[in-house]
Amino acid sequence: MALLKVYKNGKLLLDECENANHFFTRFMGLMYRRSMEEKHCLLLTPCNEIHTFGMKFDIDTIALSKDNEILFIDRAVPPKKVRKKVKDAYKVLELCSGTADKLGL
């Protein structure tokens, strides 16, 4: 999986973002992982809806447009949940729970 960096206004926010842009990498996502480091994230593309089945920890999710505009932030999503589709979303960032607030998003 390719690693990306996430910037906002030229400032580095997240230094290791996995790019899940194929069926299998999107399907697996964060399932069955024990944890996620705070400065890491997973970018699901294309994606407009997520679930947290098979996950062992809460996450923050950020729905993005094709132009990387933030459309919706869902904080502290617990395991075993399905979240609604976000209109016009093309990508979803999955982060450690609490990271969106720490980044000022």
What are these regions (language model features)?
Residues 1-105:
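Compact, glycine-rich, soluble single-domain proteins
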